[in-house]
Amino acid sequence: MNAWEQRKLGAYLTVSKNRNVDGEYDKSDVLSVSGDYGIVNQIKFQGRSFAGASVLPYGIVETGDVVYTKSPLKANPYGIIKTNHGKNGIVSTLYAVYKVNNGSNGIFVEYYFDDNLRLNKYLKPLVNKGAKNDMKVTDENVLKGDVIFPSFPEQTVIGSFFQELDQLITLQQRELEILKIMKSTLLKAMFA
């Protein structure tokens, strides 16, 4: 593939049909997709499982898979697209799970769609919203939109760069919190 040429997202991702039919995963393995935190364990993130009576039809999500959630969020009325960086698990049938094709980088895909404007512009023509604000789009149709991706080596470099930048931001945020606590403690001690 030539770099930076317009192609369908389906050139980079394929719909995963892996289901939990063997019961390999249970309710403790159910994952949710968060706009802020990505793909997370539902119980750890929300305090409980919202899974149905049976998780056998749920889709299996492996590390590196890309997931599209058909749930509207304030900044993303057509849903969000995230890559699983954590443990394997399962998602409700309301989610679409995609395998990353050879020559594609799942981390890059996530960062490509990290920009709300780009994500919304991509999904809007593909998604029909129902009367109850639910998403009317097949897993396959999500792959029919146009994207412009670089070559695989460039995708890898770009994805790694933004991952490192996110890690640096996280470290700086922790340092900021420590400094705020220190300031508060010193002010209390000074004026006690």
Question: What kind of region is each of these model predictions?
Answer:
Residues 53-117:
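A short beta-sheet element
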Residues 10, 20-52:
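DNA target-recognition patches
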Residues 1-20:
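Non-catalytic DNA-recognition/assembly elements of restriction-modification systems
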Residues 112-132:
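Charged, low-complexity intrinsically disordered regulatory segments in eukaryotic signaling
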Residues 1-6, 145, 151-192:
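Amphipathic alpha-helical segments with low aromatic content
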